[in-house]
Swiss-Prot record:
SUPFAM superfamilies: Anticodon-binding domain of a subclass of class I aminoacyl-tRNA synthetases, Methionyl-tRNA synthetase (MetRS), Zn-domain, Nucleic acid-binding proteins, Nucleotidylyl transferase. It comes from Flavobacterium psychrophilum (strain ATCC 49511 / DSM 21280 / CIP 103535 / JIP02/86). InterPro entries: aa-tRNA-synth_I_CS, Anticodon_Met, Met-tRNA-synth_bsu_C, Met-tRNA_ligase_1, Met-tRNA_synth, Methionyl/Leucyl_tRNA_Synth, MetRS_core, MetRS_Zn. Gene3D superfamilies: HUPs (3.40.50.620), Isoleucyl-tRNA Synthetase, Domain 1 (1.10.730.10), Methionyl-tRNA synthetase, Zn-domain (2.20.28.20), Nucleic acid-binding proteins (2.40.50.140). It comes from the Bacteria. Homodimer. Binds 1 zinc ion per subunit. It catalyses: tRNA(Met) + L-methionine + ATP = L-methionyl-tRNA(Met) + AMP + diphosphate. Its cofactor is Zn(2+). ATP binds at residue 339. Residues 584-686 form the tRNA-binding domain. The gene is metG. This is Methionine--tRNA ligase.
Length: 686
């Protein structure tokens, strides 16, 4: 762990440009990295916060084929969507680059060539899966099969998303091509491998011995499991038609494996930024006084803690990450987030339904971040976080301070009189919070840090509630000047301390308090007058509006519709029954009828007792449809009735027929009935 670094290089996992960004990405990677970077800048630190679009690999080619466009068109489309989402949610990258950029192609090629020239790769001809029908080798997501470790039948050729294991395509049991559905054959091909086994001792000493106390247990444990299991050579090239060409002779048709080229994207993004800003990029990657931190999700731990460090060690001139604070996964309403199944809250769609409420989502995701275990996002919790915390605690305090200052002093910060013991204690407690919040942030405990920020707002609310300036203004207006001065110091401190977490709120507070000077993090502790007497503040505005039940129900309904659609898509039709003769069918007397009465069967949850006009009579039919319909809503409904079914007693009532039904995707029943009006009761169906 580096003590007192001169600069910080912060990286956030490169998002893959085959789809938009959802709340899982934001909670797992981009919120914590943004909070950390913003906090460091408020400390006056030299920060390079780097990210960019990951634009190579099999998933891009697959998306292009699915959408009927070129890979370049795919990455251009989603790079634009992703960039906008990051801007919309205030993710403060110093540079957001692209791995399709020339500077990245050059950087990745040079990196590979240096290791190649040093003899760090193993060149080997191996047997790989090959789709003869598509005339293509099957790497990564071009092949699915059964995971040899957990039995998941939908594991990919590079990773099992169920158990998180990193795989080779040849590890899969019963592999199938995702291009044609064919069973692949084995075919020889030449590739280059990074011999990870050579770096086992280095990784053991560096991580298992050197970072046991400061790396998160979930990260340390996964890395230890990998090392203890024995590291093996890892391919760094692929047989693909999209990506960075392998820059050596005899490598025609080969591309750099996306997980070799992608982390180098952090370096090329830094080069691009440094050239633009007139800085020396090497200081941020090759200087021992620089602290390098990778923010990722748990599915990327092996790449950032084993493969990329081995690459950096092999190259020889780069620093190693000081920490890799990977998060676990965020689930949605009890189910795993899934882009393919549209089980997600997409950032661009969120803003359509909750305009200008970016900080509410930032808050809810940070408060419930999956820092040490998988966590669940629910819309009810989102609503409660806004209404009961942001609005009721934070927003309420700011509103009272601004309203009372404008009411009593026409918006001018009053000159305080002598501080009471309560005032002194409150201001002393306030000055302690920056260090408390810093301690949490610097240990990557962002949930804990956010909780301490809210305690500052609670401190302000308690101070006002105990002091009651709205009552005292009638009896001791001079005392109220001091009370409001203290409250305004807390409000200004909140403006500074909330910026890493709630940047849009911080900007609103700038306008409300008319703060022009750039206050630093440590000013809250060292500066006794964060906002000066005589300073005129602005008018108040509602920071956090109440989120109503109807808004939340709309989101829940949207997810239910998605769930229903997924059930329908995945549901397989029942196999055809045995053949019957026409005479068997002709025996059934099917007629149109109308339900004229309906009531629930006593002591039965599923049964309704119906009176049905069949055109030939009015008869009683007991039907198991009570879980799909209420009696009131089906009176007058036309239905299809099997009228010559032998009567059958159900709970003591004789049922004299059967009504034809079918199933909807959500499991409810639906009537099979005429699709036009005017069909009379008793009309036959044949």
């Amino acid at each position: 762990m580096i003590q007192n670094p001169k600069r910080y290089t912060i990286t956030a996992a490169l998002p893959y440009t085959n789809g938009p960004i959802h709340i899982g990405h934001l909670a797992g990677v981009y919120m914590p990295s943004d909070i950390y970077s913003r906090y460091l800048r408020l400390q006056g630190k030299d920060v390079a916060f780097m990210c960019g679009s990951d634009e190579h690999g099999v998933a891009i080619s697959m998306k292009a084929k699915k959408e009927g466009i070129t890979p370049q068109e795919v990455i251009d489309k989603y790079d634009g969507i992703i960039r906008k989402s990051f801007v919309d949610f205030g993710i403060s990258f110093d540079n957001y680059s692209r791995t399709s950029a020339k500077i990245h192609h050059d950087t990745a090629s040079e990196f590979f060539k240096k290791l190649y020239d040093k003899g760090d790769f193993i060149e080997e001809v191996t047997e790989q899966l090959y789709d003869a029908k598509a005339d293509q080798f099957l790497a990564d997501r071009f092949v699915v099969g059964t995971c040899p470790k957990c039995g998941n039948e939908e594991a990919y050729g590079d990773q099992c998303e169920k158990c998180g294991s990193t795989l080779n395509a040849t590890d899969l049991i019963n592999p199938k091509s995702t291009i044609t559905g064919e069973t692949p054959i084995m075919k020889s091909t030449k590739h280059w491998f990074l011999p990870l086994d050579r770096y086992s001792d280095f990784l053991t000493k560096w991580i298992l011995e050197g970072h046991k106390s400061d790396w998160k247990p979930n990260v340390y444990g996964q890395v230890k499991s990998w090392i203890d299991g024995g590291l093996e050579p890892r391919a760094v090239t692929r047989d693909l038609d999209w990506g960075i060409d392998v820059p050596v002779a005899g490598a025609e048709g080969k591309k750099l494996y996306v997980w070799f080229d992608a982390p180098i994207g952090y370096i090329s993004a830094t080069k691009e930024w440094a050239a633009r800003e007139g800085k020396d990029w090497e200081l941020y990657w090759k200087n021992e006084d620089t602290k390098l931190v990778h923010f990722i999700g748990k599915d990327n731990i092996v790449f950032h803690c084993i493969i990329f460090p081995a690459m950096l060690k092999a190259e020889g001139s780069y620093i190693l990450p000081d920490n890799v604070p990977a998060n676990e996964f965020l689930n949605l309403e009890g189910n795993k987030l899934s882009t393919s199944k549209n089980w997600a809250v997409w950032l661009h769609e969120y803003l359509e339904d909750f305009p200008n409420q970016q900080d509410v989502l930032r808050y809810a995701l940070t408060a419930n971040a999956p820092e040490s275990k998988d966590n669940d996002f629910t819309w009810k919790d989102f609503q409660a976080r806004n209404n009961n915390e942001l609005a009721a605690i934070f927003g309420n305090f700011i509103n009272r301070v601004v309203v009372l200052t404008n009411k009593y002093y026409e918006g001018v910060v009053p000159t305080p009189n002598k501080f009471s013991e309560v005032d002194e204690a409150t201001l002393t407690e306030l000055k302690a919070y920056p260090a408390v919040i810093s301690s949490s942030i610097e240990r990557y405990r962002f949930r804990e840090a956010l909780g301490e920020l809210m305690n500052v707002a609670r401190l302000g609310n308690k101070y006002l509630a105990d002091e009651e300036p709205w009552k005292m203004v009638k009896t001791d207006p001079e005392r109220v000047k001091t009370q409001m001065y203290v409250a305004l110091q807390i409000a200004t401190a909140l403006r500074v301390l909330c910026e890493p977490f709630l940047p849009f709120t911080a900007e609103k507070l700038n306008k409300m308090l008319k703060i022009d000077a750039k206050l630093s993090w440590n000013d809250v502790t060292t500066n006794s007058d964060l906002i000066l007497a005589g300073h005129k503040i602005g008018e108040g505005e509602i920071l956090f509006a109440q989120i109503e039940d109807e808004q939340i129900q709309k989101q829940i309904d949207k997810l239910e519709a998605t769930k229903t659609a997924n059930i329908a898509e995945n549901k397989k039709a029942e196999p055809q029954k045995e053949l019957i003769q026409y005479d068997d069918f002709a025996k059934m007397d099917l007629r149109v009828g109308t339900i004229i009465e309906a009531e629930k069967m006593p002591k039965a949850n599923k049964l309704l007792v119906l009176k049905v006009d069949t055109g030939i009579d009015v008869r009683t039919i007991v039907s198991g449809i009570a879980e799909s319909f209420s009696p009131e809503e089906i009176i007058g409904k036309q239905v299809t009735v099997l009228v010559n079914l032998a009567p059958r007693a159900l709970r003591g009532i004789e049922s004299q027929g059967m009504i034809l039904m079918t199933n909807l995707p959500d499991g409810k029943l639906a009537f099979v009935n005429p699709d036009v009006a005017g069909v009379g009761n008793g009309e036959g169906i044949n």
